[in-house]
């Protein structure tokens, strides 16, 4: 697989090495790796939560999913025996994994979504928020975190984010780290201490953009929850049954609307009306991937 060629003639392995080294060196767009923690710094609205004008989930600082995916990239390069002139990829990966401790909120039982700071600030000096989002699931589903923290975080996700067919992008609970959303005319669009939006309806800039990643449920995250169940309880037969049941909650959607497809998003509040595009590749391919995994 890694010998396959990308569009520019490089192998996929060469592309992966290029990504890792570009992050470590810093990119012209402001992405950088903190030398101390090896966590990835992201400028405002650079992640998949990228709504802008207004920026409704800016997440400037160290987002948790970037840390996990970077750790997995480094571990994969180490497993493939790729060498470099500086610190080995395996050592860098270990530093990222150790630094995930900066995200864990023992007082809340789940991982902070982002360590907030401006560019040039080390992760150790950033502020961990208390925003419960599904991004932390990657740490569990990819096997980066396997201890009691995984079980606690998974439980929090189940209590506050899980809905039929998807996971809420933000828990419907108050926060202490404020998330103010400011409109194009400088007006405050939300209650910064209660930033959850339960429905994805209304005007695009003042209602739908703020709701898009702040409560709206996303279908592509549901399989990650099922996968995390299996990772966390690998010897529990009930976990596999529960994972199948979770994915099975999408059966109705497959038989309605755009037949054989799954929607992009749905309202975070019941009855969880389907929203966004009728056929979302993220949703379909992730469900298929994990369903096939459950069958093995």
PLM regions with names:
Residues 5-8, 59, 146, 214, ...:
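Generic alpha-helical structural element
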Residues 41-62, 113, 117-125, 200-211, ...:
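Acidic/His metal-coordination segments adjacent to aromatic residues that form catalytic metal sites
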Residues 229-256:
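C-terminal hydrophobic structural anchor segments
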Residues 180-235, 239, 288-293:
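C-terminal substrate/ligand-recognition segments
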Residues 1-44, 51, 63-71, 129, ...:
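Aromatic-rich carbohydrate-recognition surfaces in CAZymes
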Residues 24, 28-35, 68-185, 250-284:
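Catalytic cores of carbohydrate-active enzymes
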Residues 3-11, 74-90, 232-237:
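Inter-helical turn/loop segments and adjacent helix faces that build the functional surface
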Residues 13-17, 90-95, 155-156, 241-245:
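Beta-strand segments within the central parallel beta-sheet cores of soluble alpha/beta enzyme folds
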